[in-house]
């Protein structure tokens, strides 16, 4: 029997069960601090072209306690083939011996840690939200609806899609896991909305409201330099925070298109350590990095250890 055959491999459902949102949020907060302190190595992701417009993404990261490698294939033509667009796994290894410890489902890790990073930013920059608007009706919106329900159970969740029907269908499909979900009534965003999260694949703005005190805007969907979900004027008039300063300079299209002064952009670590004082119109842009996948693997490792002690 090979070492690989002895390595536990968890599918999407089992991976989700290992990544409880409150535990993931707490581990992410510690990992953000470790990453900012230089205790985690997380190089820029390697992108390798596949056939028919697909790409293979290689994202390793290592710390004193764990090393991980996320390998994900994104194949846009898979929908027509009846296959998932995103396929991949995250391998967690002992940081000293290199032995493989377990393997998690890649898309599930990405989806849950992305939603948890958003929630961590909301908690740190805004506190407990009352009325949240999700713009988008795809998988990322579903992950965020589940995360917000777990972490902010008293908040009401509004959804706006490209069509009113898509928002209604999304709410009906996911209300069992997020009972506070409701379609936004009309296109205008009510003043009561205190957190807006953009979760689309649009390359042009889906959020154009003016920057305003008391409302946190979180940009999640845009991940290339020329794509922006949030209007440039809104970006320029907001106080800016990013999850990963290194990656944001290349991938945070909302900020790049707005031609922001990067010296004025704070990091999530700055917020968590008290260097950045919240207040005024604020915008939090996330681009993700392998260090956040490492946080997910730390969470899964701890969950597995807890199971063994029962």
Swiss-Prot record:
Keywords per UniProt: NADP, Oxidoreductase
Gene Ontology molecular function terms on file: oxidoreductase activity
GO cellular component assignments: cytoplasm
Enzyme class: oxidoreductase
Catalytic activity: L-proline + NAD(+) = 1-pyrroline-2-carboxylate + NADH + H(+); L-proline + NADP(+) = 1-pyrroline-2-carboxylate + NADPH + H(+)
Family from the record: Belongs to the ornithine cyclodeaminase/mu-crystallin family.
Protein name, entry field: Delta(1)-pyrroline-2-carboxylate reductase 1
UniProt organism field: Burkholderia multivorans (strain ATCC 17616 / 249)
Gene assigned in the entry: ocd
């Amino acid at each position: 029997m090979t070492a690989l055959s002895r390595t536990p491999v968890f599918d999407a459902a089992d991976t989700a069960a290992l990544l409880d949102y409150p535990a993931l949020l707490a581990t992410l907060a510690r990992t953000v601090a470790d990453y900012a302190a230089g205790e985690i190595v997380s190089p820029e992701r390697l992108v390798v072209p596949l056939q028919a417009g697909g790409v293979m993404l290689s994202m390793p990261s290592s710390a004193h306690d764990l090393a991980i490698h996320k390998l994900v294939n994104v194949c846009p033509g898979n929908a027509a083939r009846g296959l998932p667009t995103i396929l991949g796994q995250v391998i967690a290894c002992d940081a000293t011996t290199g032995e493989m410890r377990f393997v998690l489902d890649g898309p599930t890790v990405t989806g849950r840690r992305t939603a948890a990073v958003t929630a961590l930013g909301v908690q740190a920059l805004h506190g407990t939200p009352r009325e949240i608007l999700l713009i988008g009706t795809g998988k990322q919106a579903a992950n965020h609806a589940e995360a917000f329900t777990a972490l902010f159970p008293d908040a009401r969740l509004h959804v706006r899609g490209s069509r009113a029907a898509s928002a209604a269908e999304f709410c009906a499909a996911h209300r069992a896991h997020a009972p506070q979900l409701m379609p936004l009534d009309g296109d205008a965003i009510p003043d009561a909305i205190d957190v807006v999260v953009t979760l689309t694949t649009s390359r042009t703005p889906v959020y154009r409201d003016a920057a305003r005190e008391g409302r946190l805007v979180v940009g999640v969907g845009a991940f290339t330099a020329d794509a922006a979900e949030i209007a440039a004027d809104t970006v320029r008039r907001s106080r800016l925070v990013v999850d990963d300063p290194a990656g944001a300079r290349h991938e945070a299209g909302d900020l790049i298109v707005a031609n922001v002064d990067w010296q004025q952009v704070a990091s999530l670590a700055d917020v968590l350590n008290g260097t950045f004082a919240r207040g005024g119109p604020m915008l939090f842009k996330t681009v993700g990095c392998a260090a956040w996948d490492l946080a997910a693997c730390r969470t899964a490792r701890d969950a597995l250890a807890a199971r063994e002690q029962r």
